[in-house]
Amino acid sequence: MGLKIIYGRAGTGKSTFCINQIKKKINNSPTNKLILLVPEQFTFQTENKVLNAIGERYVLNAEVLSFKRLAHNVFNECGGATRTIMGDAGKSMLIFKVLEDLGDNMTVFKNASRQKGFIDIASKTITEFKKYNVNNEVLDLTINEIEDENLKMKMEELKDVFNEFNSRLHEGYVDEEDQLLLLNEKLDGCSLYDGAEIWIDEFSSFTPNQLSVIGKLLKKAKSVNITLSIDEVNSPKVESDLFVATKNTEKRLMNLIQEEGIAFNGYINLNEDIPYRFKENKELAHIERQLYAYPFKQYRGENNSLRLYRANNNYDEIEFVAKDILRLVREKQYRFKDISVICREVDNYEKVISAIFAEYEIPYYIDKKIDIASNPLIVFINSAVDIISKNWTYESMFKYLKTGLIKEFRGIEGAELIDELENYVLAYGIKGKKWMEEWVNYSSSILKEEEISEENKQRLERLNDIRETIVTPLDEFNKECKGKKTLKEFAIILYEFLDSKLNIMDTIDKYVEYFKENDMAIEAKEYSEVRDIFIDVLEQAVDVLGNEVMDLDEFMKVLNIGLSQYEMGLIPVALDQVNIGDITRIKSRGTKALYIIGVNDGVLPSASKEEGILSDNDREILLEKGISLASDTRTKIFEEQFLVYTAFTIAEEYLVVTYPLADFEGKSQRPSIIVHRLKKILPNVKEESEGFKLVNDKYDKISAKIPTLNELMIAIRKNYDGAEIDDYWKYVYDWYLREPKWKERIEYVRKGLEYTNLENNISKEKAKKLYEDNKNKISLSVSRLERYAQCPFAYYIQYGLKAKDRKIYEFTAPDLGSFMHEILDEFTNEIKEKDLKWSDLSKENCKNIINSLVDNQVKNNKSSILNSSKRYSYFTDRFKRILTKSVMVISEQMKRSDFEIYKNELAFGFSKDVNSIKLDLPSGESFYLNGRIDRIDKLNLDGETYLRIIDYKTGSKKFDLNKFYNGLQMQLLVYLDALINNSENIVENQAMPGAILYFRIDDPILKSKGDLTEEEIKSEILKELKLEGLLLDDVKVVKAMDNTLEPGTHSLIIPANMKKAGDLGKNKALITMEQFELLRKYVNEKMVEICQNMIEGKIDIEPCKENKNIVCDYCNYSHICQFDSSLEDNRYKVIPKKKDEDIWKSINEKVGGEVNGD
């Protein structure tokens, strides 16, 4: 009976020493038990190491145990397993319920207890109390002595939570920490390990409970041998000492044996000048000795074992690591299993490592736990509950359907059904109660109902069948979950919904079978394990809280808290693979080469300063009162230092340290202090980078097949552009050509060099077929011509190939425009029927008529989007206000004008008022333009008839002569020309142009420094909604448009002003009759030019760019053309900024002679 301490620095062979001792004992055929006790996470690795060292004989004579396994053995042999051990899930669910019940009585933690993550913090605190033997009596005594009121209140509430938790737990359970307390009790009367020889390895510290167990074992065992990673024993305590944690452990062990009267069998010192691990490697031995030495010594010998790499980013970093691993395997005959990659934040690196290692064909295993929240079963359960608790939202419904767990929606056919369903749901705004109703709408408009075709009726029938399949089980589930029930009742309802109604468990079994048959071990394990976890959590919840009454929301909170405690470990799929993991989880297990990545400031060593519920100051006060708990943040800094030391001493032969200059988001990063330290203790080490690599030969770019192919592409591109490349690339190219698997890819590379996204023109015949209607006529609107002028290719995609965006149930700008135009048209008809004049309308008139028209429009179209929600009801009220304000402004404009409204919504084409505008092309074809003029005003003056066109716009718009010149704003001039040409038929005599104007439909917000009078408000509104466009430069005509315009004033309703002399002020909105003629002639020629290009099949990818305005920014087809201005052949059609006088000159040069009769 006695304690022996085996000590040595990292790499001195402490673990090997223990195994060798066990081997010697086995060779002497022992009759007593031989036990190797290690931390839980290292049991599997240690068993393998012992098996490799000793062979199968070890199984019969020795055991590798953790404290948990030790307890299990004792309870099985000597009793004590009467109460079930509650797992982390049950523990968290119980803590949640305790916090819920105590929450209203809390002060300090009242708000925090409801926050996400607090349960984990509370659970850790409870665990900490138990680990450090803090019980109710200890808490009572300590709280009475605490003077700090805040800490006192905090400890009172923690005590309440702690006691309530234990009270409920111990009704039938114990937790893992209780296990050690129970183990302490049972060991006294248990002879299982009497006379055993025990080795305890890989611990740097022990909790008080673990120390108690060791104390009991010391009394029963023949010998207990404990390894500690320290440089020397019996040394004075120095807080900054690298080995301070293990030296504290040594001191506590010595105190323990003194208190218990146990013999000390001495120390075994494994420290030598060069540790066992580094016998053949002076550089790594120097790092072990000097990394944290003060003062330090420098090693100036040749360096072959350490590399430092400064990466541009994480991708560059991991690619460097991948290339170097392949070099070790190919040139140095390393096995992949001899190599490890470690970092501080493995989650951040997982994706980039997976992608790059796959490219380089490096087998690897990431030693990490994965969250189960994204598994289809967990997603399915949560989305099913979300559907009924969040009123059948689109997001929850399609999460539910896309899990692949409902048999009707599995496979390709199932995915197609979901796509069809999703398209309908998005197009018609299906949510809430609409899922429970038969779907009858198939209108193309979101504002009006339409007659449904037979084809669409059949689609609706099929969609309704699908809807029924989905809704029936969910509706039953919804009804069963209503109101409050016990947790057990909810658990039964949920499980029956999954298993009996939808056969989800059977579906999961089929997936597992499929994965196994297709060598998908990871997926098979995940699906199988998550199903078992779900059932286990459900059972734990029922056991712990089964009789608690709650609603569905609270039940799901409990369930998800339980599920959140589970993570799955990944399975190593091969024996020979690179081991990747967190720096805290990977220990030295025959690691010849080690890559430590992400060695950045604040990352390694970690700068975390999370204190938890109890701050460092709280812990100091509690320590003074006799409660010793886990380390404070200051102590953790030194523990982190020891962790770094341990990591940097894992490698036996080769160490690579890398750090990126930028993180995954592109933010700059600095190297860790460790990098600077390495440079100081090994001054001959050269820091490498993309521009400088020590292992740098011209064949460096030839590695694995995919990366080499990528480099080959770059070389081919350089050669294609005329640059010199190395000769060996020709042989690389030939190799890929000879390999059938790669030949096709090389051909793609070659074609890629010749690739251009420019489209060849289509034939005239094809253009006619694409653009002609069913009457073999090419009919289109002016806005479509403008669209072609913006970008011929976009026009071809939209109107030639008829590409359509996915229809979404939303109120868009075009919908708003249509709605406003229709109401204004109905308003005009209404006042005409009532024999009212615009100039006689009052505010009350306007408001009442508009309200009535809008209400009727919405009421008469039940499927209108404006009936769909309260949000759209608000929009409807807002539209009423805008329209009322607009018609009041129109009324005021008409009061001030001698022009009269002659006609609204005059249609060209559409078999209505006036024939289509016919354009005859030089090539013999004809185009027909259709359109609709919002409003025509007429003035009879001095025997002449003047017309002005008003176009209603829901956004701000002004006439831009430059856009007009380039074919981007032709509409009003086209309408004016057609109106003048047909005026004898329309207004019964030849008319002349008076104006083309835009009217903005709006309810403007006025900005003013002070209060405004009623009259000032009216003037400001008129000014804000002033008509914009072009006017005939004739003082009589302009005065007729605003009869309030006086000398020396500016008009509030049109873009004009009058000088004091009575003539019109200079204004680019004013143009002469001759200029109107020029514009009319030019617009016709421009339209013919555009139509000629269209019929000739020109579909150039040539988007317009005007200053910073680029058509592509608002184009839905840019992903099709893949226009890229950096490509040689991709060019914008730049609209240069010109002065109006220069544009007029250009127009005059083009068509002036024709207007003047030349």
UniProtKB/Swiss-Prot annotation:
Record text on cofactor binding: Binds 1 [4Fe-4S] cluster.
PANTHER family: RECBCD ENZYME SUBUNIT RECC
Subunit relationships: Heterodimer of AddA and AddB.
Source taxonomy: Bacteria, Bacillati, Bacillota, Clostridia, Eubacteriales
Cofactor(s) annotated in UniProt: Mg(2+); [4Fe-4S] cluster
GO BP annotation list: double-strand break repair via homologous recombination
Encoding gene, per UniProt annotation: addB
Residues involved in [4Fe-4S] cluster binding: C791, C1112, C1115, C1121
GO MF term list: 4 iron, 4 sulfur cluster binding; 5'-3' exonuclease activity; ATP binding; double-stranded DNA binding; helicase activity; metal ion binding
Protein's name according to its UniProt entry: ATP-dependent helicase/deoxyribonuclease subunit B
EC number: 3.1.-.-
Pfam family, one: PDDEXK_1
